[in-house]
Amino acid sequence: LIPEFVKAFGKSIQKGNNFVLKVCPMCEGQKTFEFVGTGGLWKCESCTNGDVYDIASLRSRLSETELYAGLAIPEPEKPSGLIEVASYVPPPERNRIPTGFTALDRTLNGLGRGGLTVVTGKTAGGKSTFTGQLALNAIQAGENVCFYSGELSSALFQNWIFSQAAGAQYMKPITTEFGRTDFAVDAEAEKYIRTWLKNRLYLYDNTDTKIISQNDIISKFEEAHRFYGCNYFVIDNLMTAKTAAAGDRDFWRAQANFTNEVKAFTNHHDVITILVAHPKKGNDGESYEDISGASEISNFATNVIGVRKFDDFDKDKMKTDADGTITVTKNREYGEVGKFDIRFDKATRRLAGYTDEVTEYDWIKEW
């Protein structure tokens, strides 16, 4: 501590190990203060504090702040990563984003910022249909969206999204050369849809490279957030992103690690991310434990949603006139879970709850 006293109060005389200072840190008067040798004897010529023989005695007479201020020693830095709960004031919550499904929004209270939602369900069970609508409803709410689709080409993705955005009124039936009845977006409506989506929906073009790694997806999302102001992200799906894993065990561990990185990205930027994951073989995604791979995938999620579209051979199809179900199997914020019947419209490729009104997106206002 000798050098700190000298630095703080100004050395006037040094005789061997004895220092005579201009200012006494005990009384702060312009008096002589002497530190004698290395034995720890503190002496002041005039103040009433008396002699202090060790640092413990000095600490007992001065507050921690006074001690560090007097010695010109910086106070210890507070440990990072620890929050005093009583004093913590959380930032005001930004607006939550609706999913567009009334029963689902009531259960989840919409989707909150910084939350990772995992969507699961069987192949051809409606997951991509569902996430496409989530993206459009986010755009309707004013968000810019970035989408990674590992299974749909850019052309097919665009066709799918345009159909969902159009709605039944602006879809016209066409007959293919093979006699199949299909549906196409009205050409005039398509112009308005393009204008509405311009600078608001971005797709990671998977035709640009043959193999897309998990790191590539995070990197592109970072760029989309920085350059295009995207705050809503969709990964469809987890299985299509390449990992460097050699075996099954390493593969599932890599998937869990990637999910953790997606969660970290979501938290850091305070955005919303939707991650599509397949269920375990033989399961339908109606339990959060059904997600294929490491258990951490569902553990990292804020919400887990199962999407199920009935096929003609589904035994549950015989019990209801619904076309499928949406099941909330995990709801970290509110704890409420539930299952809701849904309808599916083939022409528009839209899902809807039984009580939901038909959504008209804002491009129609410009019609």
Task: For every predicted segment, state its role.
Residues I217, A254-E261:
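Hydrophobic alpha-helical membrane-association signature
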Residues R194, N215-C230, G247-R249, A264-H269, ...:
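C-terminal regions of RecA-like/P-loop NTPase motor modules
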Residues D208-I211, T243-A256, G285-E289:
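Flexible beta-alpha connector loops of hexameric P-loop NTPases
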Residues V145, T273, V304-G306:
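Short, well-ordered beta-strand core segments
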Residues V234-I235, V271-H278:
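Structural recognition of the conserved hydrophobic beta-strand(s) that form the central parallel beta-sheet
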Residues L1-P76:
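N-terminal structured subdomain of primase-like DNA metabolism proteins
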Residues E143-G247:
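Conserved inter-motif catalytic segment of the P-loop NTP-binding fold
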Residues E77-Q169, K191:
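The Walker A/P-loop phosphate-binding site
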